Every structure is written in C-alpha cells, then in structure tokens.
Amino acid sequence: SPTHARRQWSLSENGFLRYGFLNDFDKAMLALVRKYKVLEMGYAWNLQMDEGNKTIVFNHDDLVFVFNWHPENSLPDYAIQVPFPGRYKMVLTTESKRFGGKGRLDENGRFFSYPHDYEGGCRLHYMQIYNVNRAATVYKRMKG
C-alpha cells in the first residue's frame, strides 16, 4: 500500500530503532567520498576477490576498500593486496560502535605493506588486517 511504501525519514530519529546508526554511517560515508574526491578518481580497481571468505578488495587511488560479507568468518592476519607500498590507516569502518558495530577493530591502528615477489619479476604489495565478518572497512595510504 502507498502508506507503507513511502519513505519514513523519522525512523533515523527514533531512539529505540537502529536506523540512526545507518543514518550516521551514511553521513560519514558521504563525507569520505567528498573529502577524498572518490567520484573524481575514475574507475575502481579490483585487487582481490575471495569467494571462499566472501571478501572483495578494491581501490580508488590511495583508498583501499574491504568488504567481508561472510555471515560467520572473521579472519585475523588476513593478507590483502594494496596498490602502493607504505603505511595505511583506517579511515572508515562499519564496525565502529558509533555506527552500531561491535567495535572489534582498532580504528587508530597503522598498517604496513610488505612486498611479495612472484616468478617473472612481478612484485605485489600486501598488508595484513583483521578481516571482520559482515563489515566494510576503508584504508588510506599515509603520505611521507
């Protein structure tokens, strides 16, 4: 019915429902897109697709996006490919308590890439993270 199919913006202001967390995350996500000009970066580059662990990793320039859709498996020391060598910091995660997450990640942590050489002279860079189930996290390469 039209009554139930309409948008109910007041739900995000309702204290006993979790829509407020979703609204807060939406604001933070849009702020990240504006701050780092994600829409001006062109196409995203797929770095990793792990069907078994239900994880996708892609980047837009210095930003690395990690999505883990697995219903149960959180993976410590999970190696993800990164586009550039260096230090990375977490800039956004659905796991944050301010977004209704469980707070299982250290949002102030720093992550360091390491090289891996393959046959034929190919060198790729990786970093290890705690890949939390049902979470999305964004990392940014630190300059200098």
Predicted regions and their residues:
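Carbohydrate-interacting/catalytic domains
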Residues: 1-144
